[in-house]
Amino acid sequence: SKKHGSAAVFSHFEGVTRLTGLDEGNITAAWLDDGWCWMIPFKDGTMSVGVVCHPDYLKSRRTPLDQFLLDTLRQSPPIAARMERARPLTPAYAAANFSYRRDTMSGDGYLMIGDAFAFIDPVFSSGVHLALNSGSLGAEVVDAFLRGSPEYAVRRKHFERMVRRGIDTFSWFIHRFNQPAFQALFVSPKRPAKIERAVLSLLAGDVFAQSKMRFPLFLFKVVYYVVFMLNWKENWSVARRRKRGSRTTVTEVTDYAVKSASA
């Protein structure tokens, strides 16, 4: 992606301390100094654990991937505590440059749905939701085309507008996920109720229709920019790093080396 470069390192583990009670099956996501991490529990007691980081942080690695993953997770004391008795079941794997978006979504005789058109950083686990909705909207376009309906052009434009709206809405939040201003707002207990409901609505996938939550989300963005400017030096530093990462292409990741090129 030209706007958001990311790299990920992940593995499966056993022995990771799980949450208890009603939270037992919940996914954990936590901010780190150099990105964020996930913990996804499986029914058999194992867990997927990984980190998403800036490409330049991955380039700085001087240890094997397994050790690099564990060292990065230690940036969060609560996560490190849950990993104390963890045992890897698979070698750590690295992936980079996984966010992308095509320039065109449809054309004469074709349209792209799901990952065929775009893949965004899975901060909010939005991939399946975006794919299913684009598939449903795309089916209406195909139906109109096969019937020779005069609505074909209108439905095709509607398909593109809705899918791009959903991706753009998620992307705005994803691109700012590691910004200090965003983190302060996202976890603030002092958010107005309407803005909090709007954020929860977004996380639930309400990103396509003309929802009544769109104005509160707009207010969230306004407040974000105000908070950004109040601490502009730190926020600008993080923003510059993100932009620099979007220009770095990691071409190969081995156990001890990272090869890269800059656009």
Question: Where would I find each of the regions flagged by the language model?
Answer:
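Charged, low-complexity, helix/coiled-coil-prone segments
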Residues: 4-19, 71-86, 100-107, 137-141, ...
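Tryptophan-centric aromatic hotspots in well-structured domains and transmembrane helices
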Residues: 10, 36-38, 52, 98, ...
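Predominantly flavin-linked oxidoreductase catalytic cores and closely associated redox partners
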Residues: 1-85
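Short hydrophobic/aromatic-rich motifs at helix boundaries and adjacent loops
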Residues: 41-43, 110-114, 170-171
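FAD/FMN-dependent oxidoreductases across multiple families
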Residues: 57-141, 147, 153-158, 165
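Electropositive phosphate-/nucleotide-binding environments in soluble metabolic enzymes
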Residues: 3, 33, 63, 125, ...
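C-terminal helical "tail/cap" subdomain of flavin- and related membrane-associated enzymes
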Residues: 140-263
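Low-complexity, flexible helical/coil segments
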Residues: 12-23, 46-47, 84-90, 145-151, ...
